[in-house]
């Protein structure tokens, strides 16, 4: 293409994404848009088309972002190229959202006509505003009996401050209002700015690994043009490659000769090493490089850490390969090798939150067929010693001796919880139980309130989300951001089985709730650990002090079965002999800890 053709084509490109809270109908709307623009033959259409991961379809949530190119003939008779970038809505996957928004000029904000604005709707809107996107409100599910579009329209204006007078009323399920949405995109979303003659700048917003073609980068071209055969350089790593193919997704991958300004597509350059392409990096030409990289999005720091160990220790290297491949298109995952006396070799992994941790775990088990044992999640603590040293602890077993500690600080988050009036009491109770400090309470309208609390991150990590959902019948929604570290009275609790410490069961707990936690865990382990041939004491200890103890009784054979009646001293002899044998066994026996026992430390639902 020459310069004029490129400029004309550029003016017809519209890049947009869809943002919404979980379950407000985002993936269904994406399906309808694909249908309306005839992206696929009718027989290829299936629900949640862009959710390509088996896990996403099963849980009904979007985890990874996805990009597709569509053509749409608008009412003005012109043909437009639309790039739809689908995003997840769950709080753990906000970074996926910020990545896709960085590649767009506009966003469709989907709000449920019955439920109105939720916490993550707001969080995603703020991300979109940070990226200066044109936001088009769409009120979805207007065919529901409980829908109240006028109230929601008012809410969008009051809470977010967007003009919602032209908000499209739609029902993705019934296919109502889809054309109006497409017309609004063409009309209101600006065309990409950028110059196809400038030095090349492409932003990598995702990537995946193909065993035959190497790493495939998902890119958005900001300036310049990239063709097959070009020598390109990754600006962060300085590595150079020759482009072997470029193309777009029309959900299926379709090869093209070149990608130019505004295009969203993929680039393969037989990149074999997973670490050479970092998400957020800028690709430029090797011969005529851009002066500076694009402003990437910030590197996310993991908040929650846990150990992952293969059940079969021979698969340690397979687990490393699996983590490397997942890390490639999940920039928020971090891992490093660690060893445990109880579990052998494995990895300490960092995640954004509990859902993120569960998903990664499930993906490893499914996609790579590796059975895992996971240890209790913990957060990063700052430990200050009496001799003036300070260091960071992300694994409870690295906690120093309590006598040497001056103070321990833990991360706190500011949690914004949106909840209907009737459940305010229940939510406050949960937050106080989690050592939360009340900050603020604001009414959104007559029926809904936003509560703001400061809560230690370690309390949210356990089962805060589950408790919140179950005590508010699923109506509460919540979003959190890290605000920094504060000192807390924290102690490390160790679990001893048969007088031996099991390092993988240690956890850090607040001194006030240590006794209760210890008691619950000891009782749980007593139920979960199978009986042995000898009796096994279970102890929860802080330093040298035993906080709670219980004993798993030994299994024993009835050695008196052969004695009919007979002399008591004969029976005594047999019983004493058995006792002696059990004692010997106890001194050499080791206790197998089942996976459920490690999970019990996580799920503290009994207290």
Curated annotation (Swiss-Prot):
SMART domains according to UniProt: EFG_C
RNA-binding among keywords: no
Enzyme Commission code: 3.6.5.n1
Gene Ontology terms: biological process: positive regulation of translation
Domain tr-type G, chain residue ranges per copy: 11-193
Alphabetical UniProt keywords: Cell membrane, GTP-binding, Hydrolase, Membrane, Nucleotide-binding, Protein biosynthesis
InterPro entries: EF-4, EFG_III/V, EFG_V-like, EFTu-like_2, G_TR_CS, LepA_C_sf, LepA_CTD, LepA_IV
Superkingdom, taxonomy of origin: Bacteria
Catalysis: reaction(s): GTP + H2O = GDP + phosphate + H(+)
Places the protein is found: Cell membrane
Membrane topology (UniProt): Peripheral membrane protein
A Pfam family matched in the record: GTP_EFTU_D2
GO CC terms, sorted: plasma membrane
UniProt GO MF annotations: GTP binding; GTPase activity; ribosome binding; translation elongation factor activity
Residues engaged in binding GTP: 23-28, 140-143
Protein task: Required for accurate and efficient protein synthesis under certain stress conditions. May act as a fidelity factor of the translation reaction, by catalyzing a one-codon backward translocation of tRNAs on improperly translocated ribosomes. Back-translocation proceeds from a post-translocation (POST) complex to a pre-translocation (PRE) complex, thus giving elongation factor G a second chance to translocate the tRNAs correctly. Binds to ribosomes in a GTP-dependent manner.
Family: Belongs to the TRAFAC class translation factor GTPase superfamily. Classic translation factor GTPase family. LepA subfamily.
Name by which UniProt lists this protein: Elongation factor 4
Organism in which the protein naturally occurs: Bacillus mycoides (strain KBAB4) (Bacillus weihenstephanensis)
């Amino acid at each position: 293409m020459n310069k004029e053709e490129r400029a004309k084509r550029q003016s017809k490109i519209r890049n947009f994404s869809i943002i919404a809270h979980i379950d407000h109908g985002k993936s269904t709307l994406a399906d309808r848009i694909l249908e309306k623009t005839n992206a696929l033959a009718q027989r290829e259409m299936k629900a949640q088309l862009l959710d390509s991961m088996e896990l996403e379809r099963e849980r009904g949530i979007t985890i990874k972002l996805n990009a597709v190119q569509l053509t749409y003939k608008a009412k003005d008779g012109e043909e437009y190229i639309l790039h739809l970038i689908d995003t997840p809505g769950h709080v753990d996957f906000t970074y996926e959202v910020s990545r896709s928004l960085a590649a767009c000029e506009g966003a469709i904000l989907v709000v449920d006509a019955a439920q109105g604005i939720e916490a993550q709707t707001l969080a995603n809107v703020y991300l979109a505003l940070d990226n200066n996107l044109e936001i088009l409100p769409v009120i979805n599910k207007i065919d529901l009996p409980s829908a109240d579009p006028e109230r929601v329209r008012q809410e969008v204006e009051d809470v977010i401050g967007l003009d919602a007078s032209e908000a499209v009323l739609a029902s993705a399920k019934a296919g109502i209002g889809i054309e109006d949405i497409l017309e609004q995109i063409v009309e209101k979303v600006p065309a990409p700015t950028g110059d196809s003659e400038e030095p090349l700048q492409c932003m990598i917003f995702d990537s995946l690994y193909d065993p035959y073609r190497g790493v495939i980068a998902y890119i958005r071209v900001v300036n310049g043009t990239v063709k097959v055969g070009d020598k390109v350089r990754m600006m962060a790593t300085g590595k150079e490659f020759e482009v072997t193919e470029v193309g777009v997704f029309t959900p299926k991958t379709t090869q093209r000769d070149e990608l130019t300004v505004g295009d969203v597509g993929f680039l393969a350059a037989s990149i074999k090493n997973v670490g050479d392409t970092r998400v957020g990096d800028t690709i430029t030409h090797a011969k005529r490089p851009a002066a500076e990289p694009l402003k990437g999005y910030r590197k996310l720091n993991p908040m929650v850490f846990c150990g992952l160990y293969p059940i079969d220790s021979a698969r340690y290297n397979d687990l490393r390969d699996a983590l490397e491949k997942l890390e490639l298109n999940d920039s928020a995952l971090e891992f490093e090798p660690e060893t445990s006396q109880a579990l052998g070799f494995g990895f300490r992994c960092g995640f954004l939150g509990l859902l993120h941790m569960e998903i990664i775990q499930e993906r490893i088990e499914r996609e790579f067929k590796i059975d895992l044992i996971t240890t209790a999640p913990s957060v990063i603590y700052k430990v200050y010693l009496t001799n003036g040293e300070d260091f960071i602890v992300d694994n409870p077993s690295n906690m120093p001796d309590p006598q040497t500690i001056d103070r321990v600080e833990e991360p706190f988050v500011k949690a914004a919880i949106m909840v209907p009036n009737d459940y305010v009491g229940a939510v406050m109770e949960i937050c106080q139980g989690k050592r939360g400090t009340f900050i603020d309470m604001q009414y959104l309208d007559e029926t809904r309130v936003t509560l703001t609390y400061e809560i230690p991150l370690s309390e949210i990590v356990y089962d805060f989300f589950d408790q919140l959902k179950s005590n508010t019948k699923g109506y509460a929604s919540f979003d959190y951001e890290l605000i920094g570290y504060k000192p807390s009275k924290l102690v490390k609790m160790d679990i001893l089985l048969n007088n031996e410490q099991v390092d993988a069961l240690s956890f850090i707990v607040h001194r006030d709730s240590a006794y209760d936690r210890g008691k619950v865990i000891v009782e749980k382990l007593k139920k979960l650990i199978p009986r042995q041939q000898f009796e096994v004491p279970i102890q929860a200890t802080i330093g040298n002090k035993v906080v709670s103890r219980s004993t798993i009784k030994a299994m024993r054979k009835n050695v008196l079965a052969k004695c009919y009646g007979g002399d008591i001293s004969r029976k005594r002899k047999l019983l004493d002999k058995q006792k002696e044998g059990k004692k010997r066994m106890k001194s050499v026996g080791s206790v197998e800890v089942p996976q459920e026992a490690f999970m019990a430390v996580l799920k503290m639902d009994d207290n």
